[in-house]
Design a protein with these regions (language model features):
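Short, charged, amphipathic alpha-helical segments
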Residues: 11, 36-44, 95-99, 121-129
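Preference for long, well-ordered alpha-helical segments
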Residues: 100-152
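Charge-rich, acidic-biased intrinsically disordered regions
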Residues: 44-45, 64-82, 121-130, 147-152
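Carboxylate-rich helix-loop segments that flank metal/cofactor sites and access channels
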Residues: 55-92, 99, 103-105
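A structural signal for well-ordered alpha-helices, especially hydrophobic packing surfaces
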Residues: 21, 28, 50-57, 79-82, ...
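Conserved alpha-helical segments that form or flank metal/cofactor-binding pockets of metalloenzymes
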Residues: 37-72, 138-146
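Alpha-helical bundle segments that constitute or directly flank the non-heme di-iron/ferroxidase center
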Residues: 1-31, 90-118, 134
Length: 152
């Protein structure tokens, strides 16, 4: 079965959501407790959005749920660990979480260029908003860490 452009766009959103959640879950133990506590509500909401999006895309676009890209995930995990050897582990993680958000924002933006049912658009808007809020939180913590390094 071939996918049309809007199905491809929505498939990309589903994959980006799955990758984002998977990356966070795989690396949560590496985050300081304060960072983990700050970021968890965003990812908890993201689980809800992912489930809602899967339901709506299955209903309206005949798309099946996407899993995270395991090979890419393994590569990202290894690369992150290597970078953490020479840099601050939390800073590396924040930068990589920001990159995950950029990928998700781009996928959402692309999906918004296609005609979609209102129920899917509503969930996409929730994803976009969640993504923007998490980016602000990540930058807030990134700036806080930079300020602490300068103070030392």
């Amino acid at each position: 079965m071939f996918l049309d452009n809007r199905q491809v766009a929505m498939d990309s959103v589903q994959e980006a959501l799955a990758d984002s959640l998977d990356y966070f879950e795989d690396n949560a133990e590496r985050l300081r407790p304060g960072l983990l506590k700050a970021f968890e509500p965003f990812y908890a909401r993201r689980v809800e959005l992912k489930q809602a999006l899967e339901t709506e895309t299955r209903k309206h676009l005949s798309l099946m749920p996407r899993d995270a890209d395991v090979e890419r995930d393994d590569y990202m995990w290894l690369w992150s660990r290597l970078k953490s050897i020479v840099s601050n582990d939390n800073q590396v993680l924040i930068n990589e979480l920001l990159e995950q958000e950029r990928v998700l924002m781009q996928a959402c933006s692309t999906a918004f260029t296609h005609p979609l049912p209102d129920s899917i658009e509503k969930v996409l808007e929730g994803c976009f908003s969640n993504c923007r809020s998490l980016i602000r939180e990540l930058y807030r913590h990134q700036m806080g860490q930079a300020a602490r390094r300068r103070a030392v």
